[in-house]
Amino acid sequence: LDSSISGKRGSDWAVIESDEGATKTILPAMHPQVLVVTNLYRDQLTRNGHPMWVYSAIKESISDKSTLVLNADDPLVSLFGKDREGTVYFGADKLSSDSDTFTSVYNDMVYCPVCSAKMDYQTYHYNHIGHYSCSKCGYKRHNTTYSVTKADLEQGYIEIDSKLRIDLTLKSL
């Protein structure tokens, strides 16, 4: 971070990436004005356990005063914004690289995080990230404020809202 040895800050803001497991300690200590959550993914089961456990640990640590910026394409991440004013959602439109069928080895979101009914997916970006809905309780992908409207991984760029082109250092989503 940008601070002197005595702890005096040199900047008014910081961008910090945190491991999911550490958020229970970090969030209450930092009181972030804005919290961005990109995904909850079964990448570190040995450290963090099931994504629902990770969700619960993060949920109880989020301040009511923080503005949330959430990935609408992740059903569990979107749940952080349920019944919360001022949440900003981002995601991706249906892309040419998407699949209509599940192709991953495991699926973290077979069941709705609200009512536990089987989730319906209209498209998968990867694993459980995509466009989803629950026919039992009505939980579904939120409308987005910002969307990836085009992704060309061979050329190495994405477009946001068909207006802003971003060249990718890594040709991957």
Regions found by a protein language model. Give the residues of each.
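Adenine nucleotide phosphate-binding catalytic loops in nucleotide-utilizing enzymes
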Residues: G91-L173
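Walker A (P-loop) phosphate-binding motif
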Residues: L1-S3, S63
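Active-site nucleotide-sugar/metal-binding loop of Leloir-type enzymes
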Residues: S6
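Flexible active-site lid/hinge loop adjacent to a nucleotide/diphosphate
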Residues: R9-Q122
